[in-house]
Amino acid sequence: MGIPCHFALFELQPGFRLDLEQLATRYRELARGVHPDRFADASEREQRSALEQSARLNDAYQTLKSPAQRARYLLTISGHEVPMEVTVHDPEFLLQQMQWREELEDLQDSADLAGVAAFKRRLKTAQEELNESFAACWDDAAQREQAERLMRRMQFLDKLTYEVRQLEERLDD
């Protein structure tokens, strides 16, 4: 028996556009049913099975709730090979990455919390635009290569957003 598709676990059709509230509600419903505590008095085999189901459910939920991870997952299940590390041949985006990194470094050096907040808002806007672009590409099977490029941009912005959150925490201390 194969591992069910993440979308199938939540009884959703595979696609990029998701109702995240519906996903969260369904996750909570399913999580209650497989929570390991419910199997405390069960056999060791049933406990292990519940733990595995819970872990698989958590992994599926984390993947689907993140636009970048959802995009990568969709590309993967559609048969589009997506290597983890790849040289990006996108000079415009590489330049943008360098500018963002320099700006983040300047914000760190100046300990500018207001500047960090403004930077974070701009990143959020850029992420939302990429999400919309990916969704449009995903709807057109002829644009899978463009969808992969957009997914890589989404992953970069996720990583940069994580670094911004870390900087905020350091500056708050």
From Swiss-Prot:
It holds the Pfam family DnaJ. One of its GO terms (biological process) is [2Fe-2S] cluster assembly. Residues 5-77 form the J domain. One of its GO terms (cellular component) is iron-sulfur cluster transfer complex. InterPro entries: DnaJ_domain (IPR001623), HscB (IPR004640), HscB_C_sf (IPR036386), HscB_oligo_C (IPR009073), J_dom_sf (IPR036869). It comes from the Bacteria. CDD domains: DnaJ. Signal peptide: none annotated. PROSITE patterns: DNAJ_2 (PS50076). GO terms for molecular function: ATPase activator activity; protein-folding chaperone binding. Keywords: Chaperone. SUPFAM superfamilies: Chaperone J-domain, HSC20 (HSCB), C-terminal oligomerisation domain. Belongs to the HscB family. Co-chaperone involved in the maturation of iron-sulfur cluster-containing proteins. Seems to help targeting proteins to be folded toward HscA. Interacts with HscA and stimulates its ATPase activity. NCBIfam families: hscB (TIGR00714), PRK00294.1 (NF001420). This is Co-chaperone protein HscB homolog.
